[in-house]
């Protein structure tokens, strides 16, 4: 029949019946009927069938669907054993949305798009073989984690592993621009190249001289950051993966940059077309000093990056504004202008109300918690990657006189619901570290040498989590309650412990550590101080019950790990980051990331299809009270949960604030009226800062007409 000739299918209609209650009952069984119909009408008749996995592999290699090299690293008998092992796990999709997303977005199809060449088991099979790189034991371990949905590789890794005609295994990058035309030109080229391969790109513009600054002694000659933003926006628009998907980028600017107001104004709905950016995302880098000046209702000075670099000999990004603020103010050689700190705070809140932007990076918080040598200066398209970077020096021939380091994000997620029933929590995490290590080792973005250089030195990855709200609801625990906060802390403590264990094992095996390990807090042992006190253990009876049977490291265990790390090092500079999850959380049938759900029955608008309804995982009469929408929740509860995880995460967490334009009565004690105000957002940002939150992603506002502001999720970076 072929997928393009499908007629009279019933699964969309059956799925849509979920949204039509009968006698007050949600028709959840209709989703199971839709799932069954999808396999019967779509998958089974349009899947190519092979007599054996050997025949399938031979066909896929001959037809140039999968690579040969990684298959040849294994014995033919092992390939059959592994495939049988995966089949024996009896994997089944739990919802129509999960199956639909997998077959629509991830399953390999014939070149004409008419037939499926892969099932979920096949995709897991090729992922495990590819990531294990010839090691049979590791291949079994990785397959075991993915097929039981304890581990989910990020979309680019899961989708492309093993394919002959594939994209990169990573799709998220960070680059820094310095204050010269060679760097600007090189960065534009980098953006084009990264967008071409489907990457979402974070760009730091804080080093660029402001509008009106001198160029070669000519006063008023510089155009500032806004024209450069327009160049980047046009680059992403032009380089769009053969017309399949618009490129995606975010530009970050320090709030003490003189162009900060002009920067924010580019996203306003009434902005002049000459300066307005429609598709580029905005982020602000916020030092502690800004919060202090706003709290005191004082004026703030904005400093010229050109004069700062001239005076101090380093780019603006590498000046600690909080530490040197008074010195910069007093220095007559530093150009500066004044604005009211609270006026800027209000401008940020206004724009977040209007567009969901800017993202916020609390840069001093991030650097205080950073255990490695160097400075974090920015984040990525989803605000969870926080890694040190070094600037480059480029001559007029476009050659690197000094090769800096930029960042690629190698991501994956644990599934909280399924991890909590893992037969061996530690072994599960260690298998994930092996899979992610392969991704970082095999990613070579040669078109952008600074990213390739940074990746080869740091060997970083970002393991995160999804399904927290699903797990809490199924355990009849309210999201944001003390038990939920305690659970989150212990869960992420375990992720930290076991990723450290395996990173140390790999460093010992290979005799290699990440660059400048000896200058890190891991090397001197101070990183472990908070753990060797023994404070991170379950305390409440409920949380003790949840972790019953799961190994919880004691102070002595942490001390032993500290000594091993001091002796043999760590292979990975960074290990943990919590990304926002898109399609992969649906495939895993759990809530996205670690934030609350937005709807008990989520409505998704799918291209060319229409609406698909997705009931929250484990939704039942018993769990409904625990599935409170994020839009009806005090955001301080969400911040508290994220703060508990942040304690253990060496990078960042993609924290979205969910607001209603009309805020429910009694939700926030300072509210006299229901209408959302800029003050509400300012209070919440300050609360997050005081709780140690490193970054804030979107502010999503649910408006009276049922629409959302700021909900246009970035696909390039969502995992």
Language-model-derived ranges and their functions:
Residues 1-719:
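Extended catalytic cores of very large enzyme megasubunits
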